[in-house]
Regions:
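Glycine-/small-residue-rich active-site loops that bind phosphorylated ligands and cofactors
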Residues: 58, 62, 96, 148, ...
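Conserved catalytic cores of soluble enzyme domains
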Residues: 119-123, 127, 131-266
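A structural preference for short, pocket-lining loop segments at secondary-structure junctions
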Residues: 50-53, 69-117, 124-145, 165-169
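Residues that form or flank phosphate/diphosphate-binding pockets in enzymes
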Residues: 65, 99, 151
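Short, histidine-centered active-site or binding-site loop motifs used for metal coordination
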Residues: 55-59, 111, 174
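Single, functionally critical "micro-switch" positions that shape active/binding sites
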Residues: 66, 102, 159
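Intrinsically disordered, low-complexity segments enriched in small/flexible residues
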Residues: 1-90, 191-218, 228, 234, ...
Length: 333
């Protein structure tokens, strides 16, 4: 795979020098490197024991919404890492936008037909996939760029590290369509809030900030702002030149792969519980009285507050675990 251009002076094709900071996936995709190609996603061998899962939606290639094809290819790649065949994975591609969320048409169709078990299964499959990414045997490095919305955020947040393009528009925007994040987004935002923030901030202050970010469907207009809003972690890498994204992510994956240990399962999450939820509910009532939100907005806000404050089990002296948050998130969704 070499690039060449026609040189008008030499009057013949001239091979371009390979930039060591750039992996061109279009050139890299030869028969030997593509391990499996599905309708909307593919698994590639990037060399050095690193896999690449890339999206190329057959329905909306410009936006790359999540569908079952994405989940299948991510699961295949994770299984290859689990078996020891490969040691790390890069989640990224070189399309127009990284991922503009989940395919809501599928969810709408299931709900309109009253197929609640199937809907629950679809959401749980996405949640389980995000947990598999988080606890993978080898590091998963995500490389987001341009639009990263809803489910797109939920796919990258559980990765071991993120290498984001400086120009990245990122946000959990589900509240804008009358839903709350359902693919693990609430759990990731809670974990990011607990790990981030200042030492002077208590659990309620951290969750209040997260509630405002998700509840108002705030979209970061840069990778740096995404860190400030809690979508990205403070130690995530930001790359100015998007062409360098995949190579930088691969280098980071190889760096992390040496002696990699998956994160510990969190069963010690201390969330505000009913007391914190009451305070958030009062704030919602204030917004409603001022005409800033509708009746339905208030209902969605209360569902979101229920999940972020830890449901019925959380409290000042009681801890909850990751799976409990995922379960109440799925129920509220």
């Amino acid at each position: 795979g070499e690039c060449s251009y026609w040189c008008p002076i030499e009057k013949h094709p001239v091979t371009m020098e390979k930039n060591p900071k750039v992996i061109n996936l279009a050139i890299h995709k030869t028969g030997k490197t593509v391990l499996k190609r599905d309708l909307s996603a593919s698994v590639l061998d990037l060399g050095d024991g690193v896999l690449n899962v890339q999206f190329h939606s057959i329905l909306q290639p410009a936006l790359n919404p999540i569908d079952s094809s994405y989940i299948e290819m991510i699961t295949l790649a994770l299984n290859l890492i689990e078996s020891g065949t490969y040691k790390a994975m890069v989640l990224g591609h070189q399309g127009q936008n990284f991922c503009a969320g989940a395919n809501l048409n599928l969810l709408l169709e299931l709900s309109n037909n009253g197929l609640w078990d199937e809907l629950n299964h679809a959401i749980k499959t996405l949640q389980d996939t995000t947990q598999q990414i988080r606890f993978a045997k080898g590091p998963v490095v995500a490389a987001p760029f341009q639009l990263v919305l809803g489910g797109g955020v939920e796919i990258i947040q559980p990765a071991a590290h993120r290498v984001a393009a400086a120009e990245t528009y990122m946000g959990l925007v589900e509240v804008g369509v009358g839903l709350i994040p359902g693919g693990g987004g609430n759990l990731r935002m809670i974990l990011n809030a607990m790990d981030g923030g200042t030492g002077r901030m208590g659990a309620f202050q951290k969750i209040q900030k997260t509630f405002e970010t998700v509840g108002f469907a705030k979209v970061a207009t840069s990778a740096d702002e995404a860190k400030h809003l809690g979508y990205l972690k403070k130690d995530d890498t930001v790359v100015l030149n998007r062409d360098h994204l995949i190579q930088t992510a691969k280098d980071k994956a190889l760096e992390l792969a040496h002696g990699y240990e998956p994160p510990a399962y969190r069963d010690d999450l201390k969330l505000p519980g009913p007391g914190g939820r009451t305070a958030l509910s009062m704030a919602l009532k204030g917004f409603k009285m001022q005409g800033k939100i509708s009746e339905h907005d208030m209902k969605i806000g209360e569902k979101l507050a229920y999940v972020l404050t830890g449901g019925d089990k959380a409290g000042l002296t009681k801890s909850v675990d990751e799976q409990y948050i995922l379960d109440i998130e799925r129920e509220a969704f």
